[in-house]
Amino acid sequence: MELGLSWVFLVAILEGVQCEVQLVESGGGLVQPGGSLRLSCAASGFTFSSYDMHWVRQATGKGLEWVSAIGTAGDPYYPGSVKGRFTISRENAKNSLYLQMNSLRAGDTAVYYCAR
């Protein structure tokens, strides 16, 4: 009986310290070519400021495509396909990542995800 109680107690402790990484995107919508959209990503379950963050996208029937990244110090990186049109930013105090997308094209149509 004592062993069983110890096991249950150990499981309870482990569950209590478990944290779940969550990344929740918002801000998408329909827009005409040439228009703009701003995406947001709310992060939780980890020390946001300690990680480089990324945006990736997936068009229907295609694989994942890297869209942008931002370092812990705020330094941005872009592939040529979006450079000059997309701007990544972060707000560490709010555990938030953003993607401002301007001069949108039909080829930008995709599901966008933030990633750690």
UniProtKB/Swiss-Prot annotation:
Its main location: secreted. Residues 1-19 form the signal peptide. PROSITE patterns: IG_LIKE. It is found in: Secreted; Cell membrane. It comes from the Eukaryota. Residues 77-114 are annotated as: Framework-3. This is Immunoglobulin heavy variable 3-13. It comes from Homo sapiens. The gene is IGHV3-13.
